[in-house]
Amino acid sequence: MRIIDLGRQNYLNVWEQMKIFTNARNKNTQDELWTVEHNPVFTQGISSKSEHILSSSDIPIIQTDRGGQITYHGPGQVVIYCLIDLKRLGVGVKKMIEIIENSIIDLLKTYAIKAHLKSDAPGVYVDNAKIAALGLKIKQSRTYHGLSLNVDMDLSPFMQINPCGYQDLKVTQLCNLTENRDTLNTIAEKLSQILINHVARNRH
């Protein structure tokens, strides 16, 4: 699996490239993880409702084709897009989501942070505050979109929405939970490698 660092990009550009990659790939195309940092943007999943936008701002709102509700992406957040052939891997969608969640939990363990899941709300949490979100699109057994992990960012835009559709859901970030100040690139590389290891262990 290849890891590609896209640097800082507008969301729409990367979303378009994900669709192009997924439509063009064949059974021999190598899976890829794209790491990226986005300019400020709200993205709505296919289950998102307008009432989850609580106030207006100059941050753009984009309706996407991923699963889930509304979330925020911005500078200081690690985003990893998972372009993976599930059929070739031999796992289902539910298992792939579990792989992503467990990879985030394992990354946070390396910073001595105990994270957990919530049965009624997707994502990864620390003391019931959301630190990571995820949402996938599956097309012909191939995934795109992926995960976002809050690292060192302005969290105030989350106050303008019900994150992932949940009212009064608290959010947190890595810099508030550890004195370690690894760079965004370092964290993205570490999480990507953990993801690759989890995928390899679950290959059938």
From Swiss-Prot:
Chief localization: cytoplasm
The keyword Cytoplasm is assigned to this record: yes
Any GO BP: protein modification process
Positions annotated to bind substrate: R66, G67, G68, Q69, I70, T71, Y72, H73, A133, L134, G135, G146, L147, S148
Compartments reported by the entry: Cytoplasm
Record carries keyword Cytoplasm: yes
Alphabetically ordered keywords of this record: Acyltransferase, Cytoplasm, Transferase
UniProt GO molecular function: lipoyl(octanoyl) transferase activity
Superkingdom of the source species: Bacteria
Catalytic activity annotation: octanoyl-[ACP] + L-lysyl-[protein] = N(6)-octanoyl-L-lysyl-[protein] + holo-[ACP] + H(+)
Pathway, per record: Protein modification; protein lipoylation via endogenous pathway; protein N(6)-(lipoyl)lysine from octanoyl-[acyl-carrier-protein]: step 1/2
GO cellular component, one term: cytoplasm
The enzyme's E.C. designation: 2.3.1.181
Residue positions of the active site: C164 (acyl-thioester intermediate)
Site (Lowers pKa of active site Cys): K130
InterPro entries: aa-tRNA-synth_II/BPL/LPL, BPL_LPL_catalytic, Octanoyltransferase, Octanoyltransferase_CS
Domain BPL/LPL catalytic: 27-204
CDD domains in the record: LipB
Note: In the reaction, the free carboxyl group of octanoic acid is attached via an amide linkage to the epsilon-amino group of a specific lysine residue of lipoyl domains of lipoate-dependent enzymes.
NCBIfam families: lipB, PRK14342.1
Role, per record: Catalyzes the transfer of endogenously produced octanoic acid from octanoyl-acyl-carrier-protein onto the lipoyl domains of lipoate-dependent enzymes. Lipoyl-ACP can also act as a substrate although octanoyl-ACP is likely to be the physiological substrate.
Assigned protein family: Belongs to the LipB family.
Name this protein carries in UniProt: Octanoyltransferase
